[in-house]
C-alpha cells in the first residue's frame, strides 16, 4: 500500500513558468528571496525546524508534495532535515559551489524553486541529509 501512496504523490506533469514579478507577488519578499534568489533563512528561525507532527511537506510555490514527516529527523543543524524526498521524481539537483565547496542544491521539479541542499552525512542506510528551508515548505498534517 505504501508503494501506491508514493506513486500517487509522484509528479509527472508540466512545469510552472512565471515571471520574477509574478513569483514575488505570489510568494512575498522573504519566500521569494529563498525560493527564487536561492538565499537561506536563518538557522533555527524556521517554522518547521522542531515540528514532530505527522504529515506531508509540500512546495510553498506550487503545492507539490516533497517530504514526509516519516522521513524527518532532528539533525540539530537549524533547518528541517529529511532522509529522502517523498518521491524521487519530485525534486532535482544542481551542483552548487557558492560557498567555496561542492554541495548539491535541491529544487522543486514542478516550479524550479530552491528548497535547500542535500549532504552525504545523514543517518544510515542512505546517509543523506536533506537540509530544507522551512519557508520553502507548507505543511499538511495527517
Report each predicted region and the residues it spans.
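A short Gly-Trp-Pro
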Residues: 14-20, 24-58, 64-142
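Hydrophobic h-region of N-terminal signal peptides that target proteins for export
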Residues: 2-10
Amino acid at each position: 500500500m505504501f508503494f501506491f501512496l508514493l506513486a500517487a504523490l509522484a509528479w509527472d506533469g508540466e512545469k510552472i513558468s512565471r515571471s520574477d514579478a509574478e513569483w514575488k507577488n505570489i510568494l512575498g519578499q522573504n519566500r521569494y528571496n529563498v525560493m527564487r534568489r536561492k538565499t537561506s533563512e536563518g538557522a533555527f528561525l524556521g517554522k518547521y525546524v522542531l515540528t514532530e507532527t505527522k504529515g506531508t511537506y509540500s512546495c510553498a510555490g506550487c503545492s507539490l508534495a516533497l517530504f514526509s514527516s516519516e522521513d524527518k529527523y532532528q539533525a540539530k543543524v537549524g533547518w528541517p532535515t529529511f532522509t529522502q524526498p517523498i518521491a524521487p521524481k519530485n525534486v532535482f539537483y544542481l551542483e552548487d559551489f557558492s560557498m567555496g565547496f561542492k554541495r548539491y542544491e535541491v529544487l522543486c521539479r514542478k516550479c524550479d524553486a530552491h528548497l535547500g541542499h542535500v549532504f552525504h552525512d545523514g543517518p544510515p542506510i542512505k546517509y543523506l541529509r536533506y537540509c530544507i528551508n522551512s519557508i520553502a515548505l507548507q505543511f499538511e498534517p495527517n
